[in-house]
Regions:
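Conserved SAM/AdoMet-binding glycine-rich loop
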Residues: 65-150
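Short, charged low-complexity linear segments at domain edges
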Residues: 1-23
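Phenylalanine-focused residue identity feature
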Residues: 7-10, 39, 48, 70, ...
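Canonical Radical SAM [4Fe-4S] cluster-binding loop centered on the CxxxCxxC motif
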Residues: 18-76
Length: 150
């Protein structure tokens, strides 16, 4: 049995669709499981992986803390960050706050490949953490969506 990978802090993937410029980016998977599109060289040579759900939930919690810091205690938000992951979460929170905290984009490509129960856990945690979210979007292959069981 492989050891569970350690949490390395808040993550964001390398791509954001232009239509998602106002969205919080939540990285659910890394890279692309298909990786055969001739028009896309972004993930070539990179191994696809699913992030552990616990890591995704920790990322959401990090953004929640950052939003609280920025809105409840702005003077505290000016203090130095503890680590790079905290800084990245605060940067994501800052830009998302400016956009109104209404939409979330699940990264990377084909995020619907994760088990439906895991997706439900992530979405419920997002809703509990950010009730203002009105829209969650993701890239997915039609073949992946067709395989999802009821």
């Amino acid at each position: 049995m492989a050891a569970e990978e350690p949490y390395r802090g808040f993550e964001q993937g390398p791509i954001r669709p232009p239509s998602e410029r106002d969205s919080l980016l939540v990285r659910v998977t890394r890279n692309c499981p298909w990786n055969r599109c001739t028009f896309c060289g972004l993930y070539k040579g990179e191994r696809f992986s699913r992030r552990p759900v616990a890591h995704v939930l920790r990322d959401i919690d990090a953004v929640r803390r950052a939003v609280d810091r920025l809105t409840v205690a702005p003077a505290v938000a000016a203090s130095p960050m503890a680590d790079e992951g905290e800084w990245l979460a605060e940067h994501a929170a800052r830009t998302w706050l400016q956009a109104g905290c209404r939409s979330v984009f699940l990264q990377d490509s084909n995020s619907l490949i994760i088990p439906p129960g895991d997706l439900e856990t992530i979405l419920l945690h997002l809703r509990a953490s950010f009730p203002s979210v009105a829209r969650v979007t993701s890239y997915a292959r039609s073949q992946t969506v067709a395989r999802i069981a009821d």
